[in-house]
């Protein structure tokens, strides 16, 4: 499986490589250098360009996007209801960016679209690093 990463920093990308491989429990090829943004707002801004690049110019299977929640609204089960969107929830916003960007992508190289996985670390990704301690 070929996976691309989009995160807020190089340190986050390094940790994500280990985390994604452990979660998926399968051999992974990471697509090029990770795609990085500087902070939360930039992740949402560059994500459409990253998705277009991955879909049309690579054979990536998935894009993993991780941002910190910081003080934003935390995603809850209520947010998963059909048609529901919370404008201050980072998970809702990133899912919407993916949906709006990829909805008109044609099938290419035998795949419908690049899959996505979005993680919002609460309160920050450093908390994930401490999991299990």
Model segments located where?
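Activity-critical C-terminal alpha-helical subdomain
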Residues: 68-133
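Extended, charge-rich low-complexity interaction segments
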Residues: 54-76
